[in-house]
């Protein structure tokens, strides 16, 4: 296999990342020597990221075979990580021997806000925030499809009231959007569709000849006591991060192996390794991230990966009591934490869960905080500090804009969210040290990517 030279800080051991950066598609996984010439390509569609994660679905398998723990030149060699999904190679484009980045000097300018807009505008498909169908444009302040636009308009113009036959929590998708009108309308309002954008005097066939008589006392549109402040539509970067959010990954613990500390730690290490592959692919879809130098991208990822992993565990655990949801099929309570020797670490993570639960963390805030945690990395090996700072500013402004539009009652909410990041980093440091100690003991097999990311953090 040909070697690949990357311009990266010498203090990091990066041979495995080099292999991942130039990984081929399923048809041809050999690394071509041309990979050493990195040229920027246009950003991939978030759909490729979503589709690609299906490689790690419950029906898949994790390759945990092979020898473990041989020492060579002072570095511990681990197992091969699971194959990288072909449609979204790490930090690069798709297809065999596709160079990572295309020279976009003619289309991308230096201002990160403009870069973000370029990346968003280059997306081939914008999705409806209500049902997930392809959006035809921005309607009533939100990216939405023609069907949801028409539904919202009919509801407001007809002043129609719906009732949910279930628990007001029906899932609204392209296929099921007609199954519950009440939940569909609530979803329209939740994503930011503006009632004020619908003209009440306009009906099929033109304007009404006579003005509609409205009882101001009973009308929610005219009664000042019932009028709610109009929420702004989502910030477009937040909307983009929602679309780019990867699908679930499952732990798939071996049911034939009895529970023990070794089984628990092996399951978590394998899960973390597969999540790392997805995180690196996800980072590429953060507006402005791919415009950083390759070295700075790797530095940010190597510094913030554990924070991103822990934030995911925290968000999945918000609806649970004193349990951590590492994956939907792997939930740890206090007894299981003791068995795995993770009680102190899990208690620290539960403190984060408690904090975010009290703040009623929303998915939009979760995906934005993940991106901010990556950009706010404490790495000392950043080459272009100004470019990274501008990326941080863009993401901070996106969070502030979202909070200003969705939580007008709490003007300090964005600041409160950012104030949780130091505790997240502190918990991340504790987790890295714990798993590094496990690595030194040599009792649990670890994949190469997970090993090298651990070593980069210590």
From Swiss-Prot:
DNA-binding region, residue intervals: 125-200
Residues carrying Phosphoserine: 45
Subcellular location, record wording: Nucleus
Effect of residue 41 to A: No effect on transcriptional activity
GO biological process: positive regulation of cold-induced thermogenesis; positive regulation of transcription by RNA polymerase II; regulation of DNA-templated transcription; regulation of transcription by RNA polymerase II; retinoic acid receptor signaling pathway
GO molecular function terms listed in the Swiss-Prot or TrEMBL record: AF-2 domain binding; DNA-binding transcription activator activity, RNA polymerase II-specific; DNA-binding transcription factor activity, RNA polymerase II-specific; estrogen response element binding; identical protein binding; nuclear receptor activity; nuclear steroid receptor activity; sequence-specific double-stranded DNA binding
Record-linked Pfam families: Hormone_recep, zf-C4
GO cellular component: chromatin; nucleoplasm; nucleus
Posttranslational mods: Acetylated by PCAF/KAT2 (in vitro).
Similarity comment: family membership: Belongs to the nuclear hormone receptor family. NR3 subfamily.
Subunit structure: Homodimer. Binds TLE1, PNRC1 and PNRC2. Binds GRIP1. Interacts with NRIP1, NCOA1 and NCOR2.
Function summary: Orphan receptor that acts as a transcription activator in the absence of bound ligand. Binds specifically to an estrogen response element and activates reporter genes controlled by estrogen response elements. Induces the expression of PERM1 in the skeletal muscle.
Protein name stated in the entry: Estrogen-related receptor gamma
Gene label: ESRRG
